[in-house]
């Protein structure tokens, strides 16, 4: 279940000074979620006692996605064992694992008749396998309940626990996503519980195990990185043979989180698409509101078409930039 409203979500940030709230530019304004479909999706998640990253991470696209009955399921509980400076997911002592969660996720996928599903999780450094087995069971449960649904996983780094990546890959998701989140220079303050090159090694390992599996990774911009650092991240991801990169604007969930250094313009985001395509990515989704799972289903179809075109020696059509509409 989602975190109770009266629970302190980020006790480790409680004594930090507040950062000033910045007014968002017009291109980052979104409508409040009010559609009947939004309410139906929310009720289904509550009824099955499931968590979504859409709610827990305060995603700005929740109204649009839930109106379309698209949701990103967050497994392994609602409390994370790490405390990244950018993330709204609650931190602290993690929940007991729900052994029936894989089947509940599969039930929701079948009920919503989803063509493509994204499954992510909190970090569970307390578990022997980091939660990899739970990911694998969830993938298999979805395959059994909705065999026509394509599956994308967005995993933590599993703290380099032996066999964890192999366990997830062997369950055969269609896309394996693991986000770098930001440039390596910013890791000590933005992602202190993780290591940049550990994440790169994880992505490279996925391709070693199964070269046919699509891999994906994303970063946020507006945290103080330079364009040159973004280009270096692109090069590092391509060296790991990553197929698809996402780039979106960082938005501070609360005044206690890392401050927004600047709002990157839509033209700059479009420029990253051009550069990324030139570096060899099959797909680059880059816009102010781009998030890892935003338009994931449509992007998966484009990704598959891009690979087919490349293998056939045809020009790979450049995808349209992801809009905020």
Swiss-Prot record:
Q: Where in the cell is it found?
A: Cytoplasm
What GO molecular function terms would the record report?
4 iron, 4 sulfur cluster binding; lipoate synthase activity; metal ion binding
**Ranges in coiled-coil conformation:** none
Top EC class of this enzyme: transferase
CDD domains cross-referenced by the UniProt entry: Radical_SAM
Where [4Fe-4S] cluster 1 is bound, by residue? 54, 59, 65, 293
Pathway stated in the Swiss-Prot or TrEMBL entry: Protein modification; protein lipoylation via endogenous pathway; protein N(6)-(lipoyl)lysine from octanoyl-[acyl-carrier-protein]: step 2/2
Q: How is this protein annotated for GO cellular component?
A: cytoplasm
Q: State the needed cofactors, names only.
A: [4Fe-4S] cluster
Cross-referenced Pfam families:
LIAS_N, Radical_SAM
Region annotation Disordered: where it falls in the sequence: 1-24
Catalysed reaction per UniProt?
[[Fe-S] cluster scaffold protein carrying a second [4Fe-4S](2+) cluster] + N(6)-octanoyl-L-lysyl-[protein] + 2 oxidized [2Fe-2S]-[ferredoxin] + 2 S-adenosyl-L-methionine + 4 H(+) = [[Fe-S] cluster scaffold protein] + N(6)-[(R)-dihydrolipoyl]-L-lysyl-[protein] + 4 Fe(3+) + 2 hydrogen sulfide + 2 5'-deoxyadenosine + 2 L-methionine + 2 reduced [2Fe-2S]-[ferredoxin]
Q: How is the cofactor bound?
A: Binds 2 [4Fe-4S] clusters per subunit. One cluster is coordinated with 3 cysteines and an exchangeable S-adenosyl-L-methionine.
Which keywords does this chain's UniProt record carry?
4Fe-4S, Cytoplasm, Iron, Iron-sulfur, Metal-binding, S-adenosyl-L-methionine, Transferase
Q: Where does [4Fe-4S] cluster 2 bind?
A: 80, 84, 87
Q: Under which EC number(s) is this enzyme classified?
A: 2.8.1.8
| Residue ranges of every copy of the Radical SAM core domain listed in the record | 66-282
Family as reported in the entry's similarity comment: Belongs to the radical SAM superfamily. Lipoyl synthase family.
Q: Could you identify this protein by its name?
A: Lipoyl synthase
Q: What is the lineage of its organism?
A: Bacteria, Pseudomonadati, Pseudomonadota, Alphaproteobacteria, Rhodospirillales
